[in-house]
From Swiss-Prot:
Protein name, UniProt field: Uncharacterized protein YbaS
Subcellular location: Cell membrane
UniProt keyword list: Cell membrane, Membrane, Transmembrane, Transmembrane helix
The UniProt record lists the keyword Membrane: yes
Pfam annotation, one family: SBF
Originating organism: Bacillus subtilis (strain 168)
Membrane topology: Multi-pass membrane protein
The keyword Membrane appears for this protein: yes
A cellular-component GO term for this protein: plasma membrane
Transmembrane segments: 13-33, 53-73, 86-106, 112-132, 147-167, 177-197, 214-234, 246-268, 272-294
Major location category of this protein: membrane
């Protein structure tokens, strides 16, 4: 994953003249990706998390209160007078948590049920939270098609997630595992296609990299890093169990950034998409970095105590 995203961005920029015009297909391709990623979820995990809500509330606080305000404030501090860049920075963090956070949480002994539940609840709420957050933080400065964004999120994220969960619920574990493994390679290829098409839409910005572009990249990296760190700190402050902290780190730090890029390209001027696409470059790299830090500072001490 850390190599897949930058490779797709580079291909999108280099092949922009061939990929431009295919933006219409992206929401449907992304709906397939969401369906494939949701096959591991079911309604029981959601019910369990709702009966023990504190870890989920902490994750949603990081995702939709702390990080949007932090990104919005950072944008106004660093890019004052540039509402499109500020909106892009904000959009990159108001979108729901990423499905791939489940992979990272499982890899580092996180609470898989909690991670799934955070993904599901955040996904279901996203058609309301994303437009509302952007309207409150950037609505006065940038024209937005709020209803269009809500419909886009419902088609790309909510309906495919529900269908994936329904398939899991109504099928045997063996059949679900078979379908999930069969769709996995196609899902990765589709993700590459989505990233490449979205990157092609902002190719001119990547082809003329200057100090301003570098400043946006550094800011995006710092904001993304803060999401992981804030989730870790809040988990420790609230004295959560180790597996819950791992889940909080990856759900709080990762975003469904490809969905954010689709929204940026579809509903905003291309400049808004620049911070979002840059965020795609850093997300998996930062996940790997925090996985290493977890092994060093969180998981090893627990193993030594045992």
């Amino acid at each position: 994953m850390p190599l897949l995203t930058p490779t797709s961005v580079v291909l999108g920029v280099l092949l922009s003249q061939f990929l431009n015009g295919y933006e219409w297909a992206v929401p449907w391709i992304f709906a397939f990706i969401t369906f494939a990623g949701s096959l591991s979820a079911n309604f029981q995990s959601l019910r369990h998390a709702l009966s023990h809500p504190l870890p989920m509330i902490l994750a949603l606080f990081v995702l939709h209160i702390f990080m949007p305000l932090f990104a919005w404030g950072s944008g106004h501090l660093i890019f004052k007078g540039d509402p499109l860049t500020i909106t892009g920075l904000t959009l990159a963090v108001v979108i729901p948590t990423g499905i791939t956070s489940l992979i990272w949480a499982a890899m580092y002994k996180g609470n898989v049920g909690l991670t799934l539940s955070i993904i599901l609840v955040d996904t279901v709420l996203s058609p309301l939270i994303v437009p509302l957050s952007l309207s409150l933080l950037a609505g006065a400065q940038v024209h937005m098609d709020v209803w269009g964004m809500m419909k886009g999120l419902i088609v790309m994220v909510v309906i495919p997630s529900f269908l994936g969960m329904l398939f899991n619920q109504m099928s045997s574990p063996e059949r679900t595992a078979f379908v999930s493994s069969a769709l996995s390679p196609f899902s990765k290829l589709c993700l590459m296609a989505v990233i490449a098409i979205n990157s092609s839409a902002i190719a001119p910005y990547f082809k003329s990299i200057d100090l301003r572009f570098a400043g946006i990249a550094v800011t995006v990296f710092f904001i993304a890093l803060t999401g992981y760190a804030a989730a870790w700190l809040i988990g420790k402050m609230m004295k959560r169990r180790q597996e819950e902290i791992v889940s909080l780190i990856f759900t709080g730090g990762m975003r469904n950034i490809s969905a954010g890029a689709v929204l940026a390209v579809t509903f905003f001027p291309s400049q808004v998409a620049v911070p979002v696409v840059i965020g795609m470059l850093f997300q998996q790299i930062l996940a790997a970095l925090f996985g290493y830090m977890l092994n060093r500072f969180e998981l090893k001490p627990m193993l030594q105590k045992a």
